[in-house]
A protein has these predicted regions:
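RNA-binding accessory domains that recognize and position tRNA/RNA substrates
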Residues: 1-157, 163-177
Length: 177
């Protein structure tokens, strides 16, 4: 198979191809990230409609950007993040995530050390799909346990997900993601 990525810098005339495509489609130029971010924040405000939002934050790009966006849109008093240490990351990575988020000014992020639970459930499991299911189920179990421990009333709190659309497809569509 062949893949072609006109968006990367080393593609000859990639920008020109995009420009021609946009011209053919009659697309109006003028899009900018600032306007898009504001549109997303307005959408978040409408969907949250006075409720608070809870989000699992891995420290990766997707969930970190979602956490930042939620905080900007709703304010930190209406957003709570939870980082789950699953014991499967690099040494001290969870501490690094928490330190980074603190440096960025986020005081509304908690951590749950569930490493022993994850590792005990994965012990002796060799098949990748079984591991994936166990990890996913354990994240859900820890999330449920932590939301109960934190006293998050489902009538007052929404659950947000920081992911990109292709990940929802990979995990079987939006039903399982």
């Amino acid at each position: 198979g062949v893949q072609f990525h006109p968006e990367v810098t080393h593609s000859v005339d990639g920008e020109k191809m995009f420009s021609n495509f946009l011209d053919i489609c009659g697309f109006e130029r003028g899009w900018n990230m600032g306007d898009y971010a504001e549109q997303l924040m307005e959408k978040v405000r409408k969907q949250a409609a006075g409720q608070k939002v809870f989000l699992l934050v891995s420290g990766g790009v997707d969930s970190t950007v979602a956490f930042e966006l939620l905080n900007k849109a709703l304010g930190p008093d209406r957003v709570l993040g939870l980082h789950i240490d699953n014991g499967l990351m690099r040494a001290s990575e969870s501490a690094g995530v928490m330190d980074f988020m603190k440096e960025q000014g986020f005081d509304n992020l908690r951590i749950a050390d569930a490493s022993e639970l994850f590792l005990s459930r994965l012990k002796g499991v060799w098949e990748p799909e079984k591991k994936r299911k166990i990890i996913g189920d354990t994240f859900l179990d820890v999330q449920a346990e932590e939301t109960a421990r934190l006293g998050l009333n489902p009538d007052e709190w929404l659950l947000a997900q920081g992911t990109i659309y292709p990940d929802t497809i990979e995990s079987g569509g939006t039903k399982n993601s």
